[in-house]
Amino acid sequence: MIRGAPAPMAEPPPVIFCHDSPKRVLVSVIRTTPATPPCSSVGEPEPPPPLVPTSPGFSDFMVYPWRWGENAHNVTLSPGAAGGVVSAGLPAATELPTLRGAPPSSASVAAVSGGEDEEEASSPDSGHLKDGIRRGRPRADTVRDLINEGEHSSSRIRCNICNRVFPREKSLQAHKRTHTGERPYLCDYPDCGKAFVQSGQLKTHQRLHTGEKPFVCSENGCLSRFTHANRHCPKHPYARLKREEPTDTLSKHQSTDNKAAAEWLAKYWEMREQRTPTLKGKLVQKADQEQQDPLEYLQSDEEDDEKSGAQRRLQEQRERLHGALALIELANLTGAPLRQ
Protein backbone atom coordinates (compact mmCIF):
# COMPACT_ATOMS: atom_id res chain seq x y z
CA MET A 1 0.00 0.00 0.00
CA ILE A 2 1.33 3.39 -0.98
CA ARG A 3 1.84 5.81 1.91
CA GLY A 4 -0.85 8.47 1.96
CA ALA A 5 -3.20 6.60 -0.42
CA PRO A 6 -6.83 6.46 0.74
CA ALA A 7 -8.19 3.14 1.94
CA PRO A 8 -10.42 1.21 -0.51
CA MET A 9 -14.17 1.61 0.11
CA ALA A 10 -15.34 -1.68 -1.37
CA GLU A 11 -17.28 -2.73 1.75
CA PRO A 12 -19.29 -0.66 4.26
CA PRO A 13 -17.31 0.09 7.40
CA PRO A 14 -18.09 -1.99 10.49
CA VAL A 15 -19.77 -0.50 13.55
CA ILE A 16 -16.65 -0.67 15.69
CA PHE A 17 -13.33 0.08 14.11
CA CYS A 18 -9.93 1.63 14.77
CA HIS A 19 -9.99 0.59 18.44
CA ASP A 20 -13.03 2.75 19.21
CA SER A 21 -14.14 2.69 22.82
CA PRO A 22 -17.77 2.06 23.80
CA LYS A 23 -17.94 5.71 24.86
CA ARG A 24 -17.04 6.87 21.34
CA VAL A 25 -19.51 4.44 19.81
CA LEU A 26 -22.30 5.82 22.01
CA VAL A 27 -21.55 9.37 20.93
CA SER A 28 -21.44 8.28 17.28
CA VAL A 29 -24.91 6.78 17.65
CA ILE A 30 -26.24 10.03 19.12
CA ARG A 31 -24.73 12.17 16.39
CA THR A 32 -27.20 13.18 13.69
CA THR A 33 -24.45 12.69 11.05
CA PRO A 34 -22.08 9.95 12.24
CA ALA A 35 -18.47 10.74 11.47
CA THR A 36 -16.29 7.79 10.42
CA PRO A 37 -12.76 8.24 11.72
CA PRO A 38 -10.24 7.34 8.99
CA CYS A 39 -8.25 4.14 9.31
CA SER A 40 -4.56 4.76 9.48
CA SER A 41 -2.00 2.85 7.51
CA VAL A 42 0.38 0.39 9.06
CA GLY A 43 3.01 2.05 11.15
CA GLU A 44 1.38 5.48 11.19
CA PRO A 45 0.20 6.63 14.64
CA GLU A 46 -3.53 7.08 15.06
CA PRO A 47 -4.55 10.75 15.42
CA PRO A 48 -5.88 11.51 18.89
CA PRO A 49 -9.68 11.73 19.13
CA PRO A 50 -11.29 15.02 20.13
CA LEU A 51 -11.34 15.58 23.87
CA VAL A 52 -15.05 16.32 24.23
CA PRO A 53 -17.16 14.92 21.37
CA THR A 54 -20.38 16.84 20.97
CA SER A 55 -23.61 16.42 19.07
CA PRO A 56 -26.52 18.79 18.41
CA GLY A 57 -28.46 19.34 21.64
CA PHE A 58 -26.20 17.18 23.80
CA SER A 59 -22.95 17.60 25.65
CA ASP A 60 -20.47 15.06 26.88
CA PHE A 61 -21.15 15.46 30.58
CA MET A 62 -24.90 14.92 30.00
CA VAL A 63 -24.38 11.69 28.06
CA TYR A 64 -21.93 10.24 30.57
CA PRO A 65 -23.05 10.63 34.18
CA TRP A 66 -19.63 9.61 35.48
CA ARG A 67 -18.18 12.83 34.03
CA TRP A 68 -20.58 15.20 35.79
CA GLY A 69 -17.96 15.93 38.42
CA GLU A 70 -15.36 16.87 35.79
CA ASN A 71 -17.71 19.43 34.24
CA ALA A 72 -19.05 20.93 37.46
CA HIS A 73 -17.33 24.22 36.60
CA ASN A 74 -19.49 24.48 33.47
CA VAL A 75 -22.70 24.55 35.50
CA THR A 76 -24.05 28.07 35.98
CA LEU A 77 -26.48 29.08 38.68
CA SER A 78 -29.27 31.56 38.21
CA PRO A 79 -28.53 34.83 40.06
CA GLY A 80 -30.64 35.40 43.13
CA ALA A 81 -31.66 31.77 43.58
CA ALA A 82 -30.87 30.66 47.11
CA GLY A 83 -31.09 26.94 46.39
CA GLY A 84 -28.93 27.01 43.26
CA VAL A 85 -31.24 26.64 40.26
CA VAL A 86 -29.30 25.00 37.45
CA SER A 87 -29.34 26.69 34.06
CA ALA A 88 -31.14 25.31 31.03
CA GLY A 89 -28.02 23.49 29.82
CA LEU A 90 -28.25 20.99 32.70
CA PRO A 91 -31.25 19.38 34.40
CA ALA A 92 -31.92 20.12 38.03
CA ALA A 93 -29.55 18.32 40.36
CA THR A 94 -32.37 16.52 42.12
CA GLU A 95 -33.64 15.16 38.76
CA LEU A 96 -30.30 13.81 37.51
CA PRO A 97 -30.02 10.02 37.55
CA THR A 98 -27.36 8.50 39.74
CA LEU A 99 -25.15 5.52 39.04
CA ARG A 100 -24.35 2.91 41.61
CA GLY A 101 -20.96 3.65 43.06
CA ALA A 102 -20.59 7.00 41.33
CA PRO A 103 -19.90 9.92 43.70
CA PRO A 104 -22.31 12.86 43.50
CA SER A 105 -21.04 15.93 41.76
CA SER A 106 -20.38 19.19 43.53
CA ALA A 107 -23.20 20.88 41.61
CA SER A 108 -25.79 18.33 42.72
CA VAL A 109 -24.62 18.48 46.33
CA ALA A 110 -24.81 22.27 46.34
CA ALA A 111 -28.31 22.28 44.87
CA VAL A 112 -29.64 19.69 47.29
CA SER A 113 -28.11 21.36 50.34
CA GLY A 114 -29.43 24.73 49.24
CA GLY A 115 -32.92 23.33 48.90
CA GLU A 116 -32.78 21.91 52.40
CA ASP A 117 -31.75 25.29 53.78
CA GLU A 118 -34.68 26.96 52.04
CA GLU A 119 -37.05 24.32 53.34
CA GLU A 120 -35.81 24.80 56.88
CA ALA A 121 -36.05 28.57 56.61
CA SER A 122 -39.63 28.45 55.35
CA SER A 123 -40.86 25.54 57.42
CA PRO A 124 -44.20 25.93 59.22
CA ASP A 125 -42.53 25.17 62.54
CA SER A 126 -40.80 28.54 62.45
CA GLY A 127 -43.70 30.06 64.36
CA HIS A 128 -47.00 30.70 62.60
CA LEU A 129 -50.27 30.70 64.49
CA LYS A 130 -53.79 30.05 63.30
CA ASP A 131 -54.59 33.77 63.29
CA GLY A 132 -51.72 34.47 60.89
CA ILE A 133 -49.52 36.27 63.45
CA ARG A 134 -45.91 35.15 63.49
CA ARG A 135 -44.56 34.19 66.89
CA GLY A 136 -41.07 33.58 68.14
CA ARG A 137 -37.73 35.26 67.60
CA PRO A 138 -37.34 36.54 64.00
CA ARG A 139 -34.40 35.55 61.87
CA ALA A 140 -31.45 37.92 61.95
CA ASP A 141 -31.67 38.68 58.22
CA THR A 142 -35.31 39.77 58.53
CA VAL A 143 -34.90 42.28 61.35
CA ARG A 144 -33.97 45.11 58.98
CA ASP A 145 -37.04 44.36 56.85
CA LEU A 146 -39.22 44.43 59.95
CA ILE A 147 -37.82 47.84 60.90
CA ASN A 148 -38.44 49.22 57.41
CA GLU A 149 -41.94 47.79 57.43
CA GLY A 150 -42.65 49.37 60.80
CA GLU A 151 -41.76 52.85 59.51
CA HIS A 152 -44.74 52.73 57.13
CA SER A 153 -47.12 50.76 59.35
CA SER A 154 -50.20 52.24 61.01
CA SER A 155 -49.90 50.03 64.08
CA ARG A 156 -49.74 51.80 67.42
CA ILE A 157 -47.63 49.07 69.04
CA ARG A 158 -44.33 50.50 67.85
CA CYS A 159 -40.84 50.71 69.30
CA ASN A 160 -39.89 54.38 69.62
CA ILE A 161 -36.20 53.54 69.16
CA CYS A 162 -36.05 51.34 66.03
CA ASN A 163 -39.65 51.73 64.72
CA ARG A 164 -40.36 48.00 64.78
CA VAL A 165 -44.03 47.11 65.20
CA PHE A 166 -45.40 44.20 67.23
CA PRO A 167 -48.78 42.47 67.37
CA ARG A 168 -48.86 42.48 71.19
CA GLU A 169 -48.00 45.05 73.83
CA LYS A 170 -46.09 42.55 75.96
CA SER A 171 -43.88 41.65 73.02
CA LEU A 172 -43.04 45.33 72.62
CA GLN A 173 -42.16 45.70 76.30
CA ALA A 174 -39.86 42.68 76.11
CA HIS A 175 -38.26 44.05 72.94
CA LYS A 176 -37.50 47.44 74.51
CA ARG A 177 -35.32 45.70 77.09
CA THR A 178 -32.96 44.73 74.27
CA HIS A 179 -32.25 48.45 73.84
CA THR A 180 -32.06 49.37 77.52
CA GLY A 181 -30.26 46.23 78.70
CA GLU A 182 -32.76 45.90 81.55
CA ARG A 183 -33.02 42.48 83.23
CA PRO A 184 -35.73 42.85 85.84
CA TYR A 185 -36.22 39.16 86.68
CA LEU A 186 -33.56 38.14 89.20
CA CYS A 187 -32.98 34.59 90.41
CA ASP A 188 -33.05 34.59 94.21
CA TYR A 189 -31.44 31.17 94.62
CA PRO A 190 -28.51 31.39 97.07
CA ASP A 191 -25.27 32.47 95.40
CA CYS A 192 -26.84 32.57 91.93
CA GLY A 193 -27.70 36.18 91.12
CA LYS A 194 -28.49 35.68 87.43
CA ALA A 195 -30.98 38.11 85.87
CA PHE A 196 -33.23 37.66 82.86
CA VAL A 197 -35.23 39.78 80.45
CA GLN A 198 -38.45 37.72 80.63
CA SER A 199 -40.12 35.90 83.45
CA GLY A 200 -40.36 32.78 81.31
CA GLN A 201 -36.58 32.67 81.10
CA LEU A 202 -36.35 32.90 84.89
CA LYS A 203 -38.82 30.05 85.39
CA THR A 204 -36.93 27.85 82.97
CA HIS A 205 -33.61 28.69 84.64
CA GLN A 206 -34.89 27.85 88.11
CA ARG A 207 -35.51 24.27 87.03
CA LEU A 208 -31.75 23.84 87.11
CA HIS A 209 -31.86 24.56 90.86
CA THR A 210 -34.94 22.49 91.62
CA GLY A 211 -33.95 19.53 89.46
CA GLU A 212 -37.27 19.59 87.62
CA LYS A 213 -37.42 17.74 84.31
CA PRO A 214 -41.07 18.01 83.31
CA PHE A 215 -40.64 17.01 79.67
CA VAL A 216 -40.39 13.31 78.86
CA CYS A 217 -39.90 11.42 75.62
CA SER A 218 -43.21 10.28 74.12
CA GLU A 219 -41.74 6.97 72.94
CA ASN A 220 -43.18 4.01 74.85
CA GLY A 221 -40.79 2.68 77.45
CA CYS A 222 -38.34 5.58 77.19
CA LEU A 223 -37.44 7.14 80.54
CA SER A 224 -35.48 10.14 79.25
CA ARG A 225 -36.49 13.42 80.90
CA PHE A 226 -35.53 16.99 80.00
CA THR A 227 -35.58 20.43 81.58
CA HIS A 228 -36.46 22.31 78.39
CA ALA A 229 -39.17 21.69 75.81
CA ASN A 230 -36.88 22.28 72.84
CA ARG A 231 -34.64 19.29 73.53
CA HIS A 232 -34.56 16.00 71.60
CA CYS A 233 -34.15 12.52 72.98
CA PRO A 234 -30.81 11.07 71.80
CA LYS A 235 -32.36 7.61 71.45
CA HIS A 236 -35.52 8.80 69.67
CA PRO A 237 -34.66 12.12 67.97
CA TYR A 238 -37.93 12.26 66.01
CA ALA A 239 -40.21 11.66 68.98
CA ARG A 240 -42.02 14.64 70.49
CA LEU A 241 -41.74 15.58 74.14
CA LYS A 242 -44.75 15.56 76.41
CA ARG A 243 -45.13 17.34 79.72
CA GLU A 244 -45.60 15.50 82.99
CA GLU A 245 -45.84 17.20 86.36
CA PRO A 246 -42.87 16.40 88.64
CA THR A 247 -43.41 13.74 91.29
CA ASP A 248 -42.42 13.86 94.95
CA THR A 249 -39.54 11.46 94.51
CA LEU A 250 -38.05 13.44 91.64
CA SER A 251 -38.09 16.96 92.95
CA LYS A 252 -39.85 17.82 96.17
CA HIS A 253 -37.67 15.64 98.36
CA GLN A 254 -34.46 16.74 96.73
CA SER A 255 -31.75 16.70 99.38
CA THR A 256 -29.14 19.41 99.75
CA ASP A 257 -26.41 20.11 102.25
CA ASN A 258 -26.81 23.87 102.00
CA LYS A 259 -29.32 25.15 104.56
CA ALA A 260 -30.11 28.30 102.58
CA ALA A 261 -30.72 26.25 99.46
CA ALA A 262 -32.99 23.89 101.39
CA GLU A 263 -35.04 26.82 102.66
CA TRP A 264 -35.27 28.23 99.14
CA LEU A 265 -36.49 24.89 97.79
CA ALA A 266 -39.10 24.60 100.54
CA LYS A 267 -40.38 28.09 99.77
CA TYR A 268 -40.39 27.37 96.06
CA TRP A 269 -42.51 24.24 96.40
CA GLU A 270 -44.87 25.99 98.79
CA MET A 271 -45.52 28.68 96.19
CA ARG A 272 -45.97 26.00 93.55
CA GLU A 273 -48.61 24.29 95.67
CA GLN A 274 -50.52 27.56 95.99
CA ARG A 275 -50.47 28.06 92.23
CA THR A 276 -51.36 24.46 91.38
CA PRO A 277 -55.17 24.90 90.99
CA THR A 278 -54.69 27.84 88.62
CA LEU A 279 -52.04 26.06 86.60
CA LYS A 280 -54.16 22.94 86.21
CA GLY A 281 -57.11 25.00 84.97
CA LYS A 282 -54.95 26.63 82.32
CA LEU A 283 -53.53 23.31 81.19
CA VAL A 284 -57.02 21.92 80.68
CA GLN A 285 -58.06 24.86 78.50
CA LYS A 286 -54.99 24.92 76.26
CA ALA A 287 -51.74 23.00 75.78
CA ASP A 288 -48.56 24.16 77.40
CA GLN A 289 -47.24 27.27 75.63
CA GLU A 290 -43.61 26.43 76.15
CA GLN A 291 -43.95 23.04 74.47
CA GLN A 292 -45.84 24.53 71.53
CA ASP A 293 -43.29 27.27 70.87
CA PRO A 294 -40.22 27.39 73.15
CA LEU A 295 -38.78 30.53 71.52
CA GLU A 296 -41.94 32.51 72.09
CA TYR A 297 -42.14 31.26 75.67
CA LEU A 298 -38.67 32.65 76.30
CA GLN A 299 -39.58 35.99 74.73
CA SER A 300 -42.96 36.65 76.29
CA ASP A 301 -43.27 37.81 79.88
CA GLU A 302 -46.48 35.92 80.49
CA GLU A 303 -49.19 34.18 78.54
CA ASP A 304 -50.34 36.49 75.75
CA ASP A 305 -53.89 37.79 75.77
CA GLU A 306 -55.07 36.62 72.35
CA LYS A 307 -58.62 37.84 72.89
CA SER A 308 -57.62 41.44 73.54
CA GLY A 309 -55.32 41.38 70.52
CA ALA A 310 -58.15 40.21 68.27
CA GLN A 311 -60.44 42.92 69.63
CA ARG A 312 -57.79 45.57 69.00
CA ARG A 313 -57.32 44.45 65.39
CA LEU A 314 -61.09 44.44 64.88
CA GLN A 315 -61.33 47.98 66.25
CA GLU A 316 -58.61 49.16 63.85
CA GLN A 317 -60.48 47.62 60.92
CA ARG A 318 -63.66 49.39 61.97
CA GLU A 319 -61.84 52.73 62.18
CA ARG A 320 -60.46 52.27 58.67
CA LEU A 321 -63.93 51.37 57.38
CA HIS A 322 -65.50 54.44 58.98
CA GLY A 323 -62.79 56.64 57.50
CA ALA A 324 -63.40 55.21 54.03
CA LEU A 325 -67.15 55.73 54.35
CA ALA A 326 -66.59 59.33 55.45
CA LEU A 327 -64.43 59.99 52.40
CA ILE A 328 -67.08 58.50 50.11
CA GLU A 329 -69.79 60.63 51.71
CA LEU A 330 -67.65 63.75 51.37
CA ALA A 331 -67.03 63.01 47.71
CA ASN A 332 -70.76 62.61 47.10
CA LEU A 333 -71.52 65.92 48.81
CA THR A 334 -68.92 67.86 46.82
CA GLY A 335 -70.07 66.31 43.55
CA ALA A 336 -73.78 67.03 44.08
CA PRO A 337 -73.66 70.81 43.21
CA LEU A 338 -71.73 70.07 40.04
CA ARG A 339 -74.38 67.66 38.81
CA GLN A 340 -77.13 70.22 39.48
Curated annotation (Swiss-Prot):
Residues 101-114 have a biased composition (Low complexity). Its main location: nucleus. SMART domains: ZnF_C2H2. GO terms for molecular function: DNA-binding transcription factor activity; DNA-binding transcription factor activity, RNA polymerase II-specific; RNA polymerase II cis-regulatory region sequence-specific DNA binding; zinc ion binding. A zinc finger (C2H2-type) spans 157-179, 185-209. Residues 127-140, 307-317 have a biased composition (Basic and acidic residues). Residues 96-140, 280-317 are annotated as: Disordered. GO terms for biological process: regulation of transcription by RNA polymerase II. Signal peptide: none annotated. GO terms for cellular component: nucleoplasm; nucleus. Transcriptional activator. May be involved in transcriptional activation of erythroid genes. Belongs to the krueppel C2H2-type zinc-finger protein family. This is Zinc finger protein 367. It comes from Rattus norvegicus.
